[in-house]
């Protein structure tokens, strides 16, 4: 076993959890780019994650020496099963590209305007990022973008760490807010992206509706996973209840999508293009189901094994929650004005206002005193977000 390979239950759980979230991002990116090489890499990463989970299950079973131990270990195996289901679903999404099942061009256009967009850019000669480490570049806080992967020739580096160095000619695969796309392209020495052109010809209304539903299912799946892990880390039943709502919504959307796809088939130029929609929808629903499973212990008021909490605190993206205080910098300002993602690197999963939740609020969403923010991102960004939401404290005068 390599020195940097995870060795114990906690390390294996961290590696599997991080891999599951990366798999979701890469799978949808493979669909967006219609990239068979990237889809194949998703398959390889999923196999690696399966290896982590097999070792985790073996070590967890060996650690149970009493009925009390077994009850605690059961929660570890339960979470491992949910993570495994997420990986399987992501792999199913990638296989749509590998199997050439067909993806309508409307879907790729809509994915470019999803809550989080993916993109790729080649590093030009003399670019600002050339020869610099990711730690030095601080891309999440400077642009709001996370690097999913770096491709150098035919080699891929997934989920690159802070010591990874970007070189001229590298292809960066990134994800984040739409307003950050041209920021990272500028740093890579690439020209800005032009506004998306209007699609030619009158679109099929039934197909457009099916595509819109699928993009909503994608957004729901990504939010559900983030909220599920956050509910587990904070032992928060309110977050678990929101995951349940998202899972129920996903079931409804899946039924709706199947109906619209069947209606679109009669007018579609190539009905085979609709097969990919059905496969991606089923996989997206499966991700929501797995997210619901992750929240089971929180939902039922039972404490999972402490190693799960320890693992969640050590993952690459940290969960954070904070409340907007009266007189804070955040109060009365929109997310766009605060530039939360580009300034702090934190992605807002949800905002709770009273008893109502707003998932993945848009840039125009204005924060009010008392709003509870649930976000994910780098540890340094979590501290910056908290500072924005705290009212200035008067300095203590001399005694």
Q: Where do the language-model regions lie?
A:
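Cytosolic, long alpha-helical scaffolding segments
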Residues: 1-399
């Amino acid at each position: 076993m390599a020195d940097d390979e995870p060795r114990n239950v906690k390390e294996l759980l961290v590696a599997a959890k991080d891999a599951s979230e990366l798999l979701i991002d890469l799978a949808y990116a493979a669909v967006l780019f219609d990239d068979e090489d990237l889809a194949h890499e998703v398959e390889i990463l999923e196999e690696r994650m399966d290896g982590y989970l097999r070792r985790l299950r073996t070590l967890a079973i060996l650690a149970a020496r009493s009925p009390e131990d077994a009850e605690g270990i059961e929660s570890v195996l339960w979470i491992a099963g949910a993570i495994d289901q997420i990986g399987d679903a992501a792999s199913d999404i990638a296989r749509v590209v590998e199997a050439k099942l067909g993806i309508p061009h409307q879907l790729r256009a809509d994915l470019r305007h999803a809550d989080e967009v993916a993109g790729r850019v080649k590093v030009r000669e003399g670019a600002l990022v050339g020869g610099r480490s990711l730690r030095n570049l601080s891309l999440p806080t400077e642009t709001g973008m996370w690097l999913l992967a770096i491709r150098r020739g035919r080699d891929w580096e997934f989920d690159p760490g802070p010591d990874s160095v970007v070189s001229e000619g590298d292809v960066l695969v990134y994800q984040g807010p739409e307003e950050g796309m041209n920021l990272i392209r500028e740093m890579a020495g690439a020209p800005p992206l032009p506004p998306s052109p209007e699609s030619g010809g009158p679109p099929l209304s039934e197909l457009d509706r099916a595509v819109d539903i699928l993009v909503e299912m994608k957004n729901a799946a990504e939010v559900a996973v983030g909220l599920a892990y956050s509910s587990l880390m904070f032992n928060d039943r309110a977050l678990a209840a929101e995951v349940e709502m998202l899972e129920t919504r996903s079931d409804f959307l899946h039924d709706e999508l199947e109906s619209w796809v069947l209606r679109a088939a009669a007018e579609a130029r190539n009905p085979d293009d609709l097969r990919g929609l059905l496969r991606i929808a089923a996989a997206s629903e499966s991700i929501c189901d797995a997210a619901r499973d992750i929240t089971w212990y929180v939902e039922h008021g039972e404490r999972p094994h402490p190693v799960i909490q320890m693992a969640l605190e050590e993952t690459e993206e940290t969960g954070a929650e904070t409340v907007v205080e009266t007189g804070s910098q955040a109060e009365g300002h929109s997310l766009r004005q605060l530039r939360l993602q580009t300034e702090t690197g934190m992605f807002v999963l949800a905002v709770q206002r009273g008893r109502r939740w707003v998932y993945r609020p848009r840039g125009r969403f204005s924060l009010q005193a008392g709003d509870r923010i649930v976000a994910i991102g780098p540890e340094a960004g979590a501290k910056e977000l908290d500072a924005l939401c705290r009212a200035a404290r008067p300095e203590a005068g001399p005694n």
